[in-house]
């Protein structure tokens, strides 16, 4: 199950004691600030969690899989995320070994 903004708001309501409107507004503001920083071309560094960075990808040739026609893929800027050491180690501790036959 995915963690949603509504889940985060509910957690702030239950744990921190904010009312539901304040909790929802805080979550929205948090993501808005991250988005605005990235729009300005600034990296976002969340200590203990990870970094959001921007990467420019140049134009490159592509191909329509149905027709085989060559189509240029335009240059664009993409957001990348790199998990921090603390997050990586916490995730690694909670990995369950795969059972034989699982993919």
UniProtKB/Swiss-Prot annotation:
Gene3D superfamilies referenced in this protein's UniProt entry, alphabetically: IHF-like DNA-binding proteins
InterPro entries xref list: Hist_DNA-bd, Histone-like_DNA-bd_CS, IHF-like_DNA-bd_dom_sf, IHF_alpha
Compositional bias segments (type: Basic and acidic residues): 54-69
SMART domains noted in UniProt: BHL (SM00411)
Biological process annotations from GO: DNA recombination; positive regulation of metabolic process; regulation of DNA-templated transcription; regulation of translation
Sequence segments annotated as region (Disordered): 50-72
Keywords, in A-Z order: DNA recombination, DNA-binding, Transcription, Transcription regulation, Translation regulation
Keyword Transmembrane applies: no
GO molecular function, one term: DNA binding
Spans traversing the lipid bilayer: none
One Pfam family cited in the UniProt record for this chain: Bac_DNA_binding
Cystine bridges: none
One cellular-component annotation, GO: cytosol
Known role: This protein is one of the two subunits of integration host factor, a specific DNA-binding protein that functions in genetic recombination as well as in transcriptional and translational control.
Annotated NCBIfam families: himA, PRK00285.1
HAMAP family linked to this entry: IHF_alpha
Oligomer and partners: Heterodimer of an alpha and a beta chain.
Family membership: Belongs to the bacterial histone-like protein family.
Name used for this protein in its record: Integration host factor subunit alpha
Organism from which the protein derives: Coxiella burnetii (strain RSA 493 / Nine Mile phase I)
């Amino acid at each position: 199950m995915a963690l949603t903004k509504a889940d985060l708001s509910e957690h702030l309501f239950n744990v921190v004691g904010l009312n539901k409107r304040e909790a929802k507004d805080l979550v929205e503001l948090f993501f808005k600030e991250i988005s605005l920083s990235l729009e300005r071309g600034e990296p976002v560094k969340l200590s203990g969690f990870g970094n959001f960075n921007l990467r420019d990808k140049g134009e490159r040739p592509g191909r329509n899989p149905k027709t085989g026609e060559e189509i240029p893929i335009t240059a664009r800027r993409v957001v990348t995320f790199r998990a921090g050491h603390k997050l990586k180690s916490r995730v690694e501790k909670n990995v369950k070994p795969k059972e034989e036959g699982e993919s």
